[in-house]
Amino acid sequence: GTTVVAHKQQSVNRLLYKVTSHIPDTFFSLK
């Protein structure tokens, strides 16, 4: 149902947030 889709979307958003929040650290350390 829609709840499963919403739950998947939420976990995907959380994963994306984790990844994007780590990007600046790695980017600046590479620089």
UniProtKB/Swiss-Prot annotation:
One of its GO terms (molecular function) is oxygen carrier activity. The keyword Disulfide bond does not apply. It comes from Homarus americanus (American lobster). Keywords: Copper, Oxygen transport, Secreted, Transport. GO terms for cellular component: extracellular region. The keyword Ligase does not apply. Hemolymph. Hemocyanins are copper-containing oxygen carriers occurring freely dissolved in the hemolymph of many mollusks and arthropods. It is found in: Secreted, Extracellular space. This is Hemocyanin subunit 1. Belongs to the tyrosinase family. Hemocyanin subfamily. It comes from the Eukaryota.
